[in-house]
């Protein structure tokens, strides 16, 4: 395999930022020699892309399926061009993809590109993926912050201003282009074959402090009304942590790339260990 971290310069942000890249160059015979797709993985608030490398088994799952992983940093931007900060959305959607294509061979076909994220990154995956349905065949949010007004209300005014003020400005008004419900409505208006497959997951115990389960159930109800062609919502026992997101990634790979993969991995996990 090949894994490297690089610093790339963003003209939009007037700064360099890190991107991690896993490239499966020693694929097992059953996978074959061709890269099957690209997963862009987005991190959560107060963290960076290293989390996707250190905590789940993302690289092993990518190797199993012949997937390239692109894992950028995005600060605490909620994957938007910030009102009082840097232009992360422009970097992630315009500059970074162009630079990476110059550096390495990445599949550009729609059916081979996917984006996923956890927590803040779950919102980010929906924010970017639904705004660019022509780029991504699959969009996945794991324990995503999918209802920012609900989250702000729960946080209280002072904390909400500290977290969201730099992103959206003093009034904390979410612009239409950053509303994932509005973006989902635009996607649903497309012909079914032009719509990405959308997967959202949430843990049944992921309630406090930010009501993630409630946020996702409310978003689920909105999506049922909107009616995109391909939307799935899954929930099971779990809290806001990496065991849940590791399993969520397996479900995303199963749904987008390799049907049956989740059953295999769940079988691996459930197999009893016998003492001889």
What are these regions, as identified by a protein language model?
Residues 1-276:
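Non-catalytic cap/lid and distal C-terminal segments of serine-dependent acyl enzymes
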């Amino acid at each position: 395999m090949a894994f490297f971290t690089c610093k790339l310069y963003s003209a939009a942000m007037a700064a360099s930022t890190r991107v991690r890249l896993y490239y499966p160059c020693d694929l097992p015979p059953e996978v074959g020699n061709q890269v099957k797709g690209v997963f862009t993985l987005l991190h959560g608030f107060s963290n960076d892309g290293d989390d996707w490398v250190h905590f789940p088994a993302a690289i092993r799952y990518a190797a199993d399926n012949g997937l390239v992983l692109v894992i950028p940093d995005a600060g605490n931007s909620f994957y938007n061009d910030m009102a009082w900060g840097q232009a992360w959305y422009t970097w992630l959607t315009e500059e970074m993809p162009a630079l990476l294509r110059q550096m390495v061979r990445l599949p550009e076909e729609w059916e081979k590109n996917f984006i996923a994220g956890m927590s803040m990154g779950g919102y980010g995956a929906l924010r970017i993926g639904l705004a660019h349905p022509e780029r991504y065949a699959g969009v996945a949010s794991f324990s995503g912050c999918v209802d920012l007004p609900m989250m702000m209300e729960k946080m209280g005014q002072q904390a909400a201003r500290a977290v969201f003020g730099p992103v959206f400005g003093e009034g904390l008004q979410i612009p239409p282009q950053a509303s994932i419900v509005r973006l989902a409505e635009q996607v649903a208006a497309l012909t079914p074959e032009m719509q990405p497959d959308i997967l959202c997951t949430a843990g049944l115990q992921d309630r406090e402090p930010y009501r993630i389960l409630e946020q996702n159930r409310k978003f689920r109800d909105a999506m049922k009304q909107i009616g995109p062609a391909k939307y799935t919502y899954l929930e099971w026992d779990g809290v806001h942590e990496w065991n849940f997101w590791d399993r969520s990634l397996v479900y995303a790979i199963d749904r987008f790339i390799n049907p049956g993969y989740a059953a295999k991995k769940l079988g691996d996990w459930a197999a009893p260990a016998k003492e001889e």
